[in-house]
């Protein structure tokens, strides 16, 4: 959705989910900074370049890197799940920006929610699929 920020800047937002992580993403015109839960993205994601590069990938696909600040409220899951949730949220926010952005983002797979999640533990097993050791005699 599109909304006006307190300083009359147009804000585009999107929500992303991955595993147990949920990220609410806002795109604000700016210099390309990433702020996650009030911290710079590089510090929040422990300077792991793959995470930062991953969440900026939808912007790079459209040639918009450096034009929007990414403001994120993320919770749940771990860093990998949160980074992928942010990527989906950024892609959805870019669709709010312009309907023409949808086709290239869809072609790259950025608008697809990854449905894989932790499988539940079953009774009689140690984990989801790990069975107790079998003894024939």
Curated annotation (Swiss-Prot):
One GO CC term, this protein: cytosolic small ribosomal subunit
PANTHER family noted in UniProt: RIBOSOMAL PROTEIN S9, SMALL RIBOSOMAL SUBUNIT PROTEIN US9M
Protein keywords: Ribonucleoprotein, Ribosomal protein
A Pfam match: Ribosomal_S9
Basic residues bias: start-end ranges: 118-137
Protein source organism: Synechocystis sp. (strain ATCC 27184 / PCC 6803 / Kazusa)
Annotated segments matching region Disordered: 105-137
Protein name per Swiss-Prot or TrEMBL: Small ribosomal subunit protein uS9
GO biological process: translation
Keyword Ribosomal protein: yes
Similarity annotation: Belongs to the universal ribosomal protein uS9 family.
One function term, GO molecular function aspect: RNA binding
Signal sequence annotation: none
Domain of life: Bacteria
